[in-house]
Swiss-Prot record:
The keyword NAD does not apply. This is Bacteriocin serracin-P 43 kDa subunit. Keywords: Antibiotic, Antimicrobial, Bacteriocin. It comes from Serratia plymuthica. Major component of a prophage tail sheath. Antibacterial activity against Gram-negative bacterium E.amylovora. GO terms for biological process: defense response to bacterium; killing of cells of another organism. It comes from the Bacteria.
Length: 9
């Protein structure tokens, strides 16, 4: 998923 523009699941 996206978290602060970083791909994290």
């Amino acid at each position: 998923d996206y978290h602060h523009g970083v791909r994290v699941l």
